[in-house]
Amino acid sequence: MMEAQQQPSAGSLSWRLSSHPITLLTFLAFRVSSLLVYLFGLIFIDNMVMIFIITILLLAADFYYLKNIAGRRLVGLRWWNEVDPQSGDSHWVFESSEPGTKTVNPTDSRFFWLAIYAQPLLWIGLAVLALVRLKFIWLPLVAIALVLTITNSLAFSRCDKFSQASNLAGSAFSTGNLAGSIATGLVGRLFSRS
C-alpha cells in the first residue's frame, strides 16, 4: 500500500506553499548566487576581477529585486529614500499594504525574513574568514556586500515596525474611543520627528 504524502503545514519552509513561487525562487536565487560566485568563483574562473564584477552585479540585482519587487510581493513592504530639494535632507519612506487588502502568506514571510537576516551574517562570516586567511584583497567586495545587505535588512525591519505601528494606530483610531486618539497622537508624533 502506498502511504499518503504528508502535506507541509502553512508557514513551513516549502516553496510550493508560496503565494508567489516565481518571485520567491527568484529572490532566493539572487540571495544565494552572489555568495556562491564569491565562494566558488576561483574554482571555475581563474580571474579575480571577473569574480569581483560578477559578484557586484549579482549583489546589485539582489538589492534592486528585494527592495522593489520581492519585498512588496512577498510581505507587502517597500521602502525608498527621498531627498528634500530645498534642504538636501535625506529620509527613508516606508510603504506597506493596507491590512485588509493583502494577506501575507506565512511561508513567504518566513523565507523572506530568514533570508533578509541570514545573508548579512554569512557575509560577516566571510569577512572574518578573509581576515583569518590574510586575503585582504577580498575585503572591499565583502564590505560592499555588507553595506547592501545590511541596508536592506535595516530598511525592511524599520518598514515592518512602521507598518505594525500604523496598523495598531489605525485600528485604535477606528474604534473612536479616547485610547484610540491617544495612540494615534503618540504614533503620529513618534514618526513625525526627524
UniProtKB/Swiss-Prot annotation:
Pfam families: DUF846. It is a multi-pass membrane protein. It comes from the Eukaryota. Coiled coil: none annotated. The keyword Membrane applies. The chain crosses the membrane at residues 17-37, 39-59, 111-131, 136-156. GO terms for cellular component: Golgi membrane. It is found in: Golgi apparatus membrane. GO terms for biological process: protein secretion; vesicle-mediated transport. InterPro entries: TVP23-like. Keywords: Golgi apparatus, Membrane, Transmembrane, Transmembrane helix. Golgi membrane protein involved in vesicular trafficking. Belongs to the TVP23 family. This is Golgi apparatus membrane protein TVP23. The gene is TVP23.
